């Protein structure tokens, strides 16, 4: 019998001895920090590939936008129907310093407010803040029945709607123009603007469920590290490195 290759014997398959690499071993975790305007500054963690060669991890982290429930940032379930967007502007070690990027209502909250027998009034303005941020602010409001009203419906006339929309636009424009982005954020959290709109329009038509439905950031000024550090309460904007004197000489060389 001739001795040779047995074709029936199974050959070893390629790739069986290849070493399996855990994809998470090439990544590292970073902590996301919210601005000091929020009570809970620890937002969470995010993953990114480790810095290798010319690829720097901070380049992939800057500009990343995260969406967080406002209830988690404030520690209160009263804010559970609002979502806040935070944008990563600076990397400090393993901490990511963020800034306000937008605000929105949850879909279930928005749909639960739309009902029969009432009028929905919407308004939006595009305004620049005191620190050169361009924002588009959307507001919604619903009519409610007059005191001692028997009729079920509380529809507003077109003239009422136009007058209310004008008042809402004026209040939004004034509040945004006279505030920095941090000051505006502190007004949006306790819903100060909502109550002001409701009080200003009660003589035209009584309103209910007045909310800032959405805040969208359209344009931002040139990045200022000092302003961001002040916003996070970690350092003042005036702290800078000291300039080395040009006539410096090594003391050891002079004593030899």
Curated annotation (Swiss-Prot):
One of its GO terms (cellular component) is cytosolic small ribosomal subunit. Keywords: Acetylation, Cytoplasm, Ribonucleoprotein, Ribosomal protein. The modification N-acetylalanine is found at residue 2. It holds the Pfam family Ribosomal_S3Ae. One of its GO terms (biological process) is translation. The keyword Ribonucleoprotein applies. It comes from the Eukaryota. One of its GO terms (molecular function) is structural constituent of ribosome. HAMAP family: Ribosomal_eS1_euk. Belongs to the eukaryotic ribosomal protein eS1 family. Component of the small ribosomal subunit. Mature ribosomes consist of a small (40S) and a large (60S) subunit. The 40S subunit contains about 33 different proteins and 1 molecule of RNA (18S). The 60S subunit contains about 49 different proteins and 3 molecules of RNA (25S, 5.8S and 5S). This is Small ribosomal subunit protein eS1. It comes from Lachancea thermotolerans (strain ATCC 56472 / CBS 6340 / NRRL Y-8284) (Yeast).
